[in-house]
Design a protein with these regions (language model features):
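C-terminal segment of N-terminal export signals and the immediately downstream linker at the start
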Residues: 24-42
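Short, acidic/polar
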Residues: 51-65, 142-152, 260-272, 322-332
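N-terminal secretory signal peptides
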Residues: 1-7
Length: 360
């Protein structure tokens, strides 16, 4: 994970994911009536692989992961060494790839940038933080680039699947915990954070409706304009799904925690994506919610998904005050029919012990 993204997370909850998960007292014996008892759940971890680590270290770590119930890893970078050792330990190894937030791409193609309602490019005026450099999903050139990139990634035999991150528009509404940090009141949509109003999007919307979105009196309330943005991202995802399935490999995505929030905050209509599995980031601290909300979020997501599409509950380890809270979060997720858990943050031996005990 980049230092910029770590800082964004740090600002949101007052502690950095980079610091990992604090050491807590051992978890008390607590009964957990979870679906893992039937042996059908599997659990995941988001990891940025350290290229300098020795193979012996990786062999040991990934065996420990497997023994604790982890069955898959989402790697934020390419590393044949890491992927191979994970697979040797019995784990799936997927490439976690930033999709629409791509400053690296905009350096070469600034004309592909999303444009805000105020007319600003992410290249010259990125919203919120300097690394927020968003592509426009409506541009055919962007779609082709992303498909070619996916094809290149999935052509590698040691990669089992593609995991999409930042597969959305910029946050038109931030999680509640960030409003004070950025001194914003986002009870209404602010034009500087509302995307995309580039010529490609405006012309395409006008062709469908006869209206330029910039001429709309209340663009934040215009249902057809919202749907246009939902479908722009849906189209990108579903094209990438075709590429993945041509390789007979899986495709998944990290998404906002519940369908209603995802659509409202980032134009992300993830229940209409052709994914093999979905990973809602149910980071309860970001939304100033209690641990029990994890169960509510899982239940809502499961209700909206088609039968057979597994939902893995993404848990942000720094949101939990102690191991008992973490065990409760795991229980809430699994009792509401999550297919498993995915950890984000420093996965320590204590975290693995909690997972193993809470699901035994």
């Amino acid at each position: 994970m980049s230092n910029n993204r770590r800082q964004f997370l740090k600002n949101s909850i007052g502690t950095a994911a980079a610091a990992g998960f604090a050491t807590f007292p051992a978890i008390a014996n607590m009964p957990v009536d979870s679906t893992l008892k039937n042996g059908k759940n599997k659990h995941w971890v988001w990891i940025n692989p350290n290229q300098k680590e020795e193979v012996a270290v990786l062999k040991k770590r990934y065996k420990v992961f497997y023994d604790a119930g982890i069955r898959g890893i989402l790697f934020e970078a390419d590393s044949e060494k890491h992927y191979t050792e994970a697979k040797n330990a019995g784990l799936e190894a997927h490439r976690w790839n930033w999709t629409m937030n791509r400053g690296d791409v905009l350096k070469q193609h600034p004309e592909w940038s999303a444009i805000s309602r105020t007319g600003d490019s992410c290249v010259t005026k990125p919203p919120y933080v300097g690394y927020y450099k968003w592509l426009c999903p409506s541009k055919p050139e962007v779609q082709d680039f992303l498909k070619n990139e996916a094809d290149t990634i999935l052509s590698k035999k040691y990669i089992d699947g593609l995991h999409l991150d930042y597969i959305r528009f910029c946050d038109v509404v931030l999680p509640l915990n960030l409003w004070d940090t950025y001194k914003l009141d986002q009870r209404t949509e602010l034009p500087a954070y509302d995307f995309c109003y580039c010529k490609t999007c405006r012309d395409a919307y006008a062709a469908k409706t006869g209206n330029d979105p910039l001429s709309l009196r209340y663009p934040d309330a215009q249902v057809s304009w919202r749907l246009f943005r939902y479908n722009a991202i849906n189209n990108v995802v579903n094209q990438l799904a075709v590429v993945a399935h041509q390789h007979n490999k899986k495709i998944s995505a990290a998404v906002f925690p519940i369908p209603e929030l995802a659509r409202r905050m980032v134009r992300q209509d993830w229940t209409n994506w052709n994914l093999d599995m979905v990973f809602p980031m149910i980071y309860h601290g970001f939304y100033q919610e209690k641990v029990a909300w994890i169960g509510d979020a899982v239940a809502e997501g499961v209700r909206f998904l088609e039968d057979g599409v597994p939902l893995y509950a993404g848990l942000f380890l720094s949101d939990f005050n102690n191991q008992s809270e973490l065990a409760s979060g795991i229980k809430y997720a699994l009792d509401n029919k999550a297919a498993g858990i995915c950890f984000f943050g420093g996965v320590t031996d204590e975290v693995l012990a909690t997972l193993k005990q809470a699901t035994s």
